Design a protein with these regions (language model features):
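Catalytic cores of processing enzymes, dominated by hydrolases/peptidases
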Residues: 154, 163-164
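Short internal beta-strands
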Residues: 68-74, 143, 160-163
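ADP-ribose/adenylate-binding Rossmann-like module
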Residues: 137-143
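Extended, subdomain-level signal for the structured scaffold at the beginning of enzyme domains
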Residues: 2-6, 14-136, 148-155, 170-180, ...
Length: 282
C-alpha cells in the first residue's frame, strides 16, 4: 500500500518501487481516499529509459486508489528510469510482455521519456499488447512521448489527444487531432503533455479507470492546435518536476563532454592538419 502525506509531498511505500511524491499531488487531489479502483488490475508498460516521475507518480496514485499494478516490460529483471537526461532508479519488472494478456487487466498506463517509448514502439509484442487493450475497449492512459507507442500500433487515426509538444507533428501525421492542453480524454484514451501536467493527468486517469465522466477541459475538439512558437515555457515547467542534479552527476556529465570533445578532435586531427597545410601553401 502507498500513502501520500497530504500537503507534505512525501511518500511512504511498502511496494518495491521507491516513489517521490510530486509536491502538489495529495490524497484529495487524486481522489484516492475513496479507493475508487479497488479490485482493478492495471498494467504499466515500460522499458529502459522511462521518465521516472511519469511512472512513479501515477503508479503511487493508482495503488493509493486501491488498484493492483504490474510493471510489464520487454525483458525480465529491472529497468532503468531517467530524470530527463540523467539515469535514475532501477525498478523491478513483474512480467514480460510475452507472459501477459490485455485480458488479464482492467487498464493500461504507458509512461513517457525519450528512450522508453522509442524502444516500445519498435517491439511487435508491445504493439500487439497495446492494440489488444484498444480492441477490447479497455482504458489507456499515456503522457509525454508515450503516444508514440499508440502511433506505431496504428491507433491514432481519427483520435483526439495531446502529447509532449515536440512530437505534435508525429501525432498529426498518424491521423490524430492534437490539442495543446493539460489533458485530453477521447473515449477509452486519456493523454497529457508531460510532467508539468501531472496533477490533471492523474485525476483524469483515475476517472477513466473508474468509469467516471470526463472532466471539463478534457473533452475532444475537431481541429489540431498549431505548432508552438517556442519550447521554452513548457520545457521549463517540466524541469520543475525533475530532481536536482547531484554534484557528482554534473561533474560526470562535464567529464563526459570533455572526453567526447577530445575524441572528436583526435579523430579530426589529420583532416585539420591537412587543411592547415593546404592553407599555408596557398
Amino acid at each position: 500500500m502507498v500513502r501520500c502525506k497530504v500537503g507534505s509531498g512525501a511518500y511512504a511505500a511498502n511496494s518495491a518501487i521507491g516513489v517521490d511524491c510530486p509536491a502538489h499531488i495529495s490524497t484529495e487531489d487524486t481522489m484516492t481516499g475513496r479507493k475508487k479502483l479497488v479490485g482493478q488490475r492495471i498494467a504499466v508498460l515500460a522499458a529502459d529509459g522511462f521518465e521516472k516521475v511519469e511512472l512513479t507518480a501515477p503508479v503511487a496514485a493508482l495503488r493509493a486508489a486501491g488498484a493492483e499494478v504490474d510493471i510489464i516490460s520487454l525483458k525480465s529483471g529491472k529497468i532503468r528510469g531517467m530524470n530527463l537526461h540523467q539515469p535514475a532508479d532501477l525498478i523491478p519488472v513483474d512480467w514480460t510482455v510475452d507472459e501477459v494478456s490485455a485480458r488479464d487487466y482492467d487498464g493500461l498506463l504507458i509512461p513517457g521519456g525519450f528512450i522508453n517509448p522509442d524502444a516500445l514502439r519498435q517491439s511487435s509484442e508491445a504493439r500487439d499488447f497495446v492494440r489488444a487493450f484498444d480492441l477490447l475497449d479497455k482504458p489507456i492512459a499515456t503522457l509525454c512521448h508515450g503516444p508514440w507507442v499508440l502511433a506505431s500500433a496504428g491507433l491514432l487515426s481519427g483520435r483526439t489527444l495531446t502529447s509532449w509538444p515536440g512530437v505534435r507533428d508525429d501525432m498529426v501525421h498518424a491521423g490524430a487531432t492534437w490539442l495543446d492542453q493539460e489533458v485530453v480524454r477521447d473515449g477509452n484514451l486519456v493523454t497529457s503533455r508531460g510532467p508539468q501536467d501531472m496533477l490533471p493527468f492523474v485525476r483524469e486517469m483515475i476517472q477513466l479507470y473508474a468509469g467516471g465522466p470526463a472532466s471539463n477541459g478534457a473533452l475532444r475538439r475537431r481541429h489540431s492546435d498549431p505548432q508552438r512558437e517556442s519550447p521554452t515555457a513548457v520545457t521549463s515547467a517540466a524541469m520543475r518536476w525533475m530532481p536536482r542534479s547531484p554534484i557528482g552527476a554534473m561533474l560526470g556529465l562535464a567529464l563526459l563532454g570533455a572526453g567526447v570533445m577530445a575524441v572528436s578532435r583526435a579523430g579530426n586531427g589529420g583532416r585539420i592538419s591537412a587543411v592547415e597545410a593546404r592553407g599555408a601553401s596557398e
